[in-house]
Amino acid sequence: MPSSAIRGRFAALALATSLLVGCSSAPSHARTELSVVEERKAAPDFSLRDANGATLRLSDFKGRVVLLNFWATWCGPCKIEIPWFIEFENTYKNRGFAVLGVSMEDDGWRAVKPYLREKAVNYRVVLGDGPVARMYGGVESLPTTFLIDREGRIAAEHVGLAGKSTYEDQILGLLNSGKQAGAP
């Protein structure tokens, strides 16, 4: 029987590993990865319902820079990122920026709504599904985050936990480049 010190070290190592590579229910494809997209392709449009039952489409955000985040309440790295996303929404929304969360929660709104209230999430959240995840390359690890430019094209993809400054630098780069006339 292992000692409590060994069990404690193992638990700490497991936690650190999950924070570095993200959460995954798939066989060990989890990784921390950043891809800046050189040739930007259109972000796939989708239609999902928010916590109030309203239909939300990604295309509703055209003209804005969007941080599209696939997450779940049980994902440790996701819990680290959410306060950053709340801050980004507050700081940059008046410059044409929006955060859109896509919860991949198995327990649906029953788990997500209380979490959103507890964390005072100020951005739109929808419940994701398999078809939407497949449209985005088969989201296998959480968090997976896409930065979408004002023209609705994928500019960057993050798989796993990225740094706050990494997100913020990319958001500012997209906000400051290629502003469209009349963009919010």
Model-derived regions: residue spans:
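Thiol/disulfide oxidoreductase modules built on the thioredoxin-like
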Residues: 114-122, 127-172
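Structural microenvironment flanking redox-active thiols in thiol-disulfide oxidoreductases
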Residues: 79-119, 128-135
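Short active-site neighborhood of thiol/selenol oxidoreductases, capturing the structured segment around
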Residues: 56-79
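Active-site acidic short loop of glycosyltransferases
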Residues: 61-64, 94, 121-122
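N-terminal targeting signals for export/organelle localization
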Residues: 1-45, 49, 170, 179-184
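Alpha/beta-hydrolase fold active-site loops
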Residues: 65-66, 97, 143
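Hydrophobic beta-strand core positions in alpha/beta domains
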Residues: 67-69, 101-103, 146-147
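Conserved hydrophobic/aromatic "anchor" residues
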Residues: 46, 61, 70-71, 115, ...
